[in-house]
Amino acid sequence: EGDVAKIKQINIIGAAAFKESELLDLMALRTPGWLTWYTKNDQYSKQKLSGDLEILRSHYLNRGYLEFTIDSTQVSISPDKQDIYITVNITEGDRYTVSSVKLAGQMLVPETELAALVKIKPGEVFSREALNESTKAISERLGNEGYAFANVNAAPELDKEKRQVAFTVLIDPGRRVYVRRINVSGNTRTRDEVIRRELRQIESAWYDGEKINRSRTRVDRLGYFDEVTLETPPVPGTTDQVDMEIKVKEKPTGNILLGAGFSSSEKVTVQGAVTQQNLFGSGKHVGVQVSTSKSNKVY
């Protein structure tokens, strides 16, 4: 098969706001180094390159470069098929600050409350991350009121002369949704009621995103499961109903501990303990400890 081709050089063409070396340090792909024998990051991977390009894009968009684009990428290999060369051509564009942010649409929650969730403020350098966090927070707040499928999008208006951007956050709550049924599966040992008593969302009640998240957290904290997944798929044929699907993967909850000791007065002593955190799937904890020591007998 021969030797695996290694990345000989990576070039980023068009970078001015940041040093090329700084941008290269953000990427997973790199030229051979003292750790690349283990990470294999000096071997070309289309998937890794796609991830690196997204990292570059996020780096610029989170620092004000709203019009940043990756124009092209070229990957070439040397005639002897030993060296790989990667060239990324970018256009940075201007750096934008935020001039204003306003809310529009059907809010259903006091506007002042939603405005407080906006993390991007006038006068600040534009950040895609902060903008996405803002729209997500508004969507989640509406979800707490039953609007599980709310659409919240930010429409930009650029002033290229002033290098400023104004955003209008458009809010469409959609229909209010309630939880039709709660289904639990995967609990081969733990009883249904042990899981259900941890739930904060109830059946036939309005969807509440916060209560649903708390429900998943509480089930996970029981400590009986390796995995806990919670999904809320729409009920087919309806526009205002979802089911809450909880899937768990059981894990061992019992422990057996054995030990032995030696002393001049008692020679050999034996200790043992058996604990079960989820007795017969009931959620009850039981433990038994035994010691043969004359000075300290425990049953």
What feature does the model see in each segment?
Residues 1-264, 273, 287-298:
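Periplasmic polypeptide-binding modules associated with outer-membrane biogenesis and secretion
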Residues 275-277:
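Short conserved beta-strand segments at catalytic cores or DNA/RNA-binding microdomains
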Residues 279-285:
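Short loop/turn motifs that connect adjacent beta-strands in outer-membrane beta-barrel proteins
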